[in-house]
């Protein structure tokens, strides 16, 4: 009996150009459309790969933002309205798609800042929270010091002058107590109701703003890295105030927030929050969301305009950094969308390690 022949499939040339480029979008079809459209006399093979990669990236970016919009509107499916919200609430995408009409996407009303409650009178504090002098002011200070025969190290004096002028322009700003270093603002995002989120590289205890957030436990201990720095900078007075609070309330429940004076800190207030542990992933993110909401609600009761957060949850609470950052940013955005008005105008994320900075910069882009 004759042996059956084995059929060996040919493997050469079986992979498409898209798979070789690591893309889901069809590179061959894009190349064919480029040639058919007569956009140029010669179309290189690499141009189709590059264009397909850009289209794939933009599609993924819009879908992610549209998914966030659908989630915020309590919808389980993405519709054209969510795509419209995603594109128009992102500064770069809005510029890219200027003049583009999204069918069935509806319209996005433009709300003038003066019509937003408390926005007009609080706009003078837009950039007075941090002791970060403008580049031109720093150059002028260095030039003045050089002409006066002083060392260039006198930049701190210009910082003090900048902070004093900012406090003069805004009566609600915290008066400078001591000169501190300038801060580097790495990225920012303005929400649709006017609040601005900043990612900052610096020291939380040297921030000049209305309040700083202290992640703690049920006893409001200063044992953590952030807590130890806050305790050392604030002084013994904060211990007495915390002990007084604990004698009345016995403990700070998980997700709850309490507020004390800043004492020797440049900030007027310290908002203590009992941050949850990442023991159960299903409930930990909800608990962290509620923690952030409680902190912002308490800040609003004190008419706080500027508040600074460290990287909450990613230390002793064992949250993965990207999950903690995503949860915190979404919680802040959802809080401002759920209330009629808020005294908070600026939220700073004061970070010192490069990993946290990279994570917050990446997540801030996707916040709407």
Swiss-Prot record:
Name the SUPFAM superfamilies on file: Histone-fold (SSF47113), Macro domain-like (SSF52949)
- Residues in coiled coil: none
**Pfam family of the protein (one):** Histone_H2A_C
* Predominant location: nucleus
Which stretches of sequence are listed as region Disordered?
154-177
Q: Which GO terms describe its molecular function?
A: ADP-D-ribose binding; ADP-D-ribose modification-dependent protein binding; DNA binding; protein heterodimerization activity; structural constituent of chromatin
The observed outcome of changing residue 316 to R is: Reduced affinity for poly-ADP-ribose
GO BP of this protein: chromatin organization; negative regulation of protein ADP-ribosylation; regulation of NAD metabolic process
CDD domains per UniProt: HFD_H2A (cd00074)
Q: Which residues bind a glycoprotein?
A: 203-204, 225-226, 275, 313-317
Give UniProt keywords alphabetically: Chromatin regulator, Chromosome, DNA-binding, Nucleosome core, Nucleus
Ranges for domain Macro: 184-368
Cellular component, GO annotation: nucleosome; nucleus
Q: Does the keyword Ribonucleoprotein apply?
A: no
Q: Where in the cell is it found?
A: Nucleus; Chromosome
Tell me yes or no: is DNA-binding among this UniProt entry's keywords. yes
Q: Which family does it belong to?
A: Belongs to the histone H2A family.
Its biological function? Answer: Variant histone H2A which replaces conventional H2A in a subset of nucleosomes where it represses transcription. Nucleosomes wrap and compact DNA into chromatin, limiting DNA accessibility to the cellular machineries which require DNA as a template. Histones thereby play a central role in transcription regulation, DNA repair, DNA replication and chromosomal stability. DNA accessibility is regulated via a complex set of post-translational modifications of histones, also called histone code, and nucleosome remodeling.
Assembly behavior? The nucleosome is a histone octamer containing two molecules each of H2A, H2B, H3 and H4 assembled in one H3-H4 heterotetramer and two H2A-H2B heterodimers.
Q: What's in the domain note?
A: The macro domain specifically binds poly-ADP-ribose. Binds poly-ADP-ribose with much higher affinity compared to vertebrate macroH2A1.1 orthologs.
Its recorded name reads Histone macroH2A1.1
- Name the lineage: Eukaryota, Filasterea, Capsaspora
């Amino acid at each position: 009996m004759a042996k059956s022949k084995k059929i060996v499939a040919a493997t050469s040339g079986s992979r498409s150009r898209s798979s070789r480029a690591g893309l889901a979008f069809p590179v061959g079809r894009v190349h064919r459309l480029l040639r058919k459209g007569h956009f140029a006399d010669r179309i290189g093979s690499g141009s189709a790969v590059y264009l397909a990669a850009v289209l794939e990236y933009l599609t993924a970016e819009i879908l992610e933002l549209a998914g966030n919009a659908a989630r915020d509107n309590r919808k389980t499916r993405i519709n054209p309205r969510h795509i419209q919200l995603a594109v128009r609430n992102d500064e770069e995408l809005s510029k890219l798609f200027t003049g583009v009409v999204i069918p069935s996407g509806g319209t996005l009303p433009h709300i003038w800042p003066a019509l937003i409650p408390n926005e007009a009178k609080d706009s003078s504090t837009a950039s007075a929270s941090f002791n970060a002098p403008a580049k031109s002011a720093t150059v002028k200070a260095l030039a003045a010091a050089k002409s006066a025969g002083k060392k260039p190290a006198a930049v701190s004096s210009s910082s003090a002058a900048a902070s004093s002028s900012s406090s003069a322009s805004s009566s609600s700003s915290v008066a400078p107590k001591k000169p501190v270093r300038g801060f580097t603002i790495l990225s920012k995002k303005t929400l649709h109701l006017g609040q601005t989120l900043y990612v900052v590289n610096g020291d939380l205890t040297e921030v000049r703003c209305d309040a700083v957030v202290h992640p703690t436990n049920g006893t409001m201990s200063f044992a953590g890295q952030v807590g130890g720095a806050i305790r050392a900078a604030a002084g013994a007075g904060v211990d007495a105030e915390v002990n007084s609070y604990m004698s009345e309330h016995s403990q700070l429940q998980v997700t709850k927030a309490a507020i004390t004076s800043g004492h020797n800190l440049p900030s007027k207030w310290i908002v203590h929050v009992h941050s949850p542990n990442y023991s159960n992933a299903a409930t930990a993110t909800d608990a962290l969301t509620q923690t952030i909401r409680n902190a912002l609600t308490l800040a609003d009761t004190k008419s706080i305009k500027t508040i600074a957060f460290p990287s909450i949850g990613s230390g002793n609470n064992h949250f993965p950094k990207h999950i903690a950052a995503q949860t915190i940013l979404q919680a802040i955005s959802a809080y401002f969308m759920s209330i009629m008005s808020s005294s908070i105008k600026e939220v700073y994320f004061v970070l010192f390690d490069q990993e946290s900075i990279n994570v917050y910069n990446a997540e801030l882009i996707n916040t709407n």
